[in-house]
Amino acid sequence: MQYPEAIAKLIESYSKLPGIGRKSATRLAFYTLGMSDDDVKNFARSLSASKSDLTFCRICGFITSKDDDPCVICSDESRDQSKIFVVENSQDEMAIENTHDYHGLYHVLNGVLSPMEGRGPEDINITSLITRLSDHSEVKEVIIGLDASTEGEATTLYLARLIRPSGIKVTRLARGLSVGTNVDYADQLTLTQAVNGRTEI
C-alpha cells in the first residue's frame, strides 16, 4: 500500500536532509501532519525566510541577513585584523566564536575538497580567500580549523601550499580533535585547547 501523494512528497523532501533516512523522514512527515495549522504555517514561513532573507557575507562567506552584509564580525573594526580563521561552514564559525577565546576574523569555505563528490577548489571559497589575503597586508596568520577527516586534511594541506609562499604564517588546530570529529560537535573546552595549542604547518 502506498502513501497518498502529498505524504510521499513530504517524506521525499525530508529524506533529502543530511543524516535523515527513509524511516526518520517518514516519522518527521507524520509528526508534521500532527502539528497545528498555525505551527505548520510558521514552519513553512521560517523555511521560506531562511532562503529569501539570508545570504553569504560578501567578505567572509558566513551566513548573514541580507540587511547585514558584510556580516557583524567583518564589520567590527575592534576585531584582530591580523588573523583569519578558516572554517568549513557557518556552524563551525559559531562553535569557535562561542569559546570567546578567539577575536580575529573568519573565512568560511562553505565546503571542503572532495574528489569523490566532484568538489574541487573552484567549488568552494578558496579564490576569495587568496584574493582577500593579497588585498590585506595586515593579515599575519591564517588558522585552518577544518574537520579531522580525509577531506578536511586534504583541504588543509592544499590551502597551506597556496598561502605559505606569501610569507603569511599558516597554523592548524592542535590535535585535541580526534580523527573524524566535526568542529561544531566538539565541546568548548576541547575547541579552546585546540585553538590555543595550534601548530604551524
Curated annotation (Swiss-Prot):
Keyword Endoplasmic reticulum (UniProt): no
> Where does the record place the Toprim domain?
82-178
SS bond list: none
Record carries keyword DNA repair: yes
Pfam families from the xrefs? RecR_C, RecR_HhH, Toprim_4
For this chain, one GO molecular function annotation is:
zinc ion binding
InterPro entries to which the protein is assigned, alphabetical: DNA_Rcmb_RecR (IPR000093), Rcmb_RecR (IPR023627), TOPRIM_dom (IPR006171), TOPRIM_RecR (IPR034137)
PANTHER family (alphabetical): RECOMBINATION PROTEIN RECR
NCBIfam families in UniProt: recR (TIGR00615)
Q: What does this protein do?
A: May play a role in DNA repair. It seems to be involved in an RecBC-independent recombinational process of DNA repair. It may act with RecF and RecO.
**Protein name per UniProt:** Recombination protein RecR
What is the protein's species of origin? Oenococcus oeni (strain ATCC BAA-331 / PSU-1)
